[in-house]
Curated annotation (Swiss-Prot):
Location(s) in or outside the cell: Cytoplasm
Protein name per UniProt: Imidazoleglycerol-phosphate dehydratase
Example GO BP: L-histidine biosynthetic process
E.C. numbers: 4.2.1.19
InterPro entries: IGPD_sf, ImidazoleglycerolP_deHydtase, Ribosomal_Su5_D2-typ_SF
Gene from which the chain derives: hisB
Alphabetical keyword list: Amino-acid biosynthesis, Cytoplasm, Histidine biosynthesis, Lyase
CDD domains: IGPD
Pathway: Amino-acid biosynthesis; L-histidine biosynthesis; L-histidine from 5-phospho-alpha-D-ribose 1-diphosphate: step 6/9
Key word Lyase present: yes
Family: Belongs to the imidazoleglycerol-phosphate dehydratase family.
Organism of provenance: Methanospirillum hungatei JF-1 (strain ATCC 27890 / DSM 864 / NBRC 100397 / JF-1)
GO MF annotations, alphabetized: imidazoleglycerol-phosphate dehydratase activity
Entry GO CC: cytoplasm
HAMAP family: HisB
């Protein structure tokens, strides 16, 4: 079973994440940041992963540390759950619309962390999350999950753009980690991801 749990405690945050790649899209998410909970719930439902996040952060200083550290821990728990990646699809791309907004995500779950992010936000999303933190969350996840991601978002509503990104990321990760080869091989000419 492709599951993992990681706890991380620093002077800024205390985070526990339980994660299953072979889930049904169920989540229990408490970050202390309601809009971020909503985005992670959208990611969970559309990835079909099961995700439990319990986070306490120094929110009196702002959401930065909490959002960044959740990205770090979620990337780490993803890597542990994936293991060697035997039989996975590895590559996936998806386009997800949300009303006037559109997010495109292309992934390689191949052990090489890299992010190309195109798109902008007009200001703090829902007045709470500074726009640069959306990209920073994905950077933190990608560095720790060792995934290459190309992400492009356009539209008018910052809420819709952000939600389309989280949904597209979830759908693409689900497709890339789906076991499609029954030969037990790692999908790499190197023999490892």
């Amino acid at each position: 079973m492709r599951t993992a749990e990681i706890k991380r405690k620093t002077k800024e945050t205390d985070i526990t994440v339980r994660f299953s790649l072979d889930g049904s899209g169920k989540g229990t998410i408490h970050t202390g940041i309601p809009f971020f909970d909503h985005m992670l719930d959208s990611f969970t439902r559309h990835s079909r992963f099961d995700l439990d996040i319990q986070a306490i952060g120094d929110l009196e200083k702002g959401p930065h540390h909490t959002i960044e550290d959740i990205g770090i821990v979620l990337g780490q728990v993803f890597t542990h759950a994936l293991g060697e990646g035997r039989g996975i699809q590895r590559f996936a791309s998806v386009i997800v619309p949300m009303d006037e907004s559109k997010a495109e995500v292309a992934l390689d779950v191949g052990g090489r962390p890299y992010l190309v992010f195109e798109g902008s936000f007009s200001g703090p999303v829902e007045g709470v999350i500074e726009s640069w933190l959306v990209r920073h969350f994905f950077e933190s996840f990608i560095q720790n999950a060792k995934v290459t991601a190309h992400m492009n978002v356009s539209g008018f509503s910052d809420h819709h753009k952000c939600e389309a990104l989280f949904k597209a990321f979830g759908v693409a990760l689900h497709s890339a980690t789906k076991i499609v080869y029954d030969d037990g091989q790692v999908p790499s000419t190197k023999g490892v991801l």
